[in-house]
Amino acid sequence: MKNLQITAYTQSFIRQQVMPGDICIDATMGNGNDTALLSRLAGEKGHVLAFDIQKQALEHTEERLKKDNCPENYRLILDSHENMAAYAEMETVSCITFNLGYLPGGDHSVATRADSSKRAVESGLTLLKKGGLMTLCIYSGGDTGFQERDEMLAFVRQLDPHKYLVIRSEYANRPNNPPIPVPVSYTHLTLPTILR
């Protein structure tokens, strides 16, 4: 294993999940890295919704998608991720990805916040189809502090284990509060009666 970056680790889950024709959501568009990946994986017959509250993010993402020759299967939306349910139907989405923090190279005073991120995750969970995947990459420290990280980790910890599989991974020996990836799978498990 070479110097594995958290983004590559998270994207490995996404690559295994998304199939041609899938509906996907990039809840925090940023510079469009995940939007581009989702667009390529979903292909011509798929559809990608990408959200951000900063016009700069939409402009950067549009440039990125054109430069990468991505299929025109996407819709870039200037709106908060907590409103994603207004743009997709329940239980139709294969993959939703979040990068929580602020836009790299952007205004650090504009960042995701725990209250809106929790509402967005709750909304997103209703959109996932059975077998769907949500990935959270939680950045903390620096300008954004630790409140969102702590609240989001507590929130996913309490998700119904009969419906969701939540995995928390982190660097054990990296300083400076490295990001924490958290994949959440909508499994809708049926546990044996003895385990209920």
What are these regions (language model features)?
Residues 1-20, 62-88:
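S-adenosyl-L-methionine
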Residues 22-30:
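Conserved class I S-adenosyl-L-methionine
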Residues 31-42:
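Conserved SAM-binding loop of SAM-dependent methyltransferases across substrates and taxa
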Residues 47-52:
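Conserved SAM-binding motif I beta-strand of class I
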Residues 87-95:
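A short acidic, Gly/Pro-enriched loop at the edge of an enzyme's catalytic core
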Residues 131-138:
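Conserved beta-strand signature within the Rossmann-like core of class I S-adenosyl-L-methionine
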Residues 187-193:
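Conserved small/polar residues in nucleotide/adenosyl-binding loops
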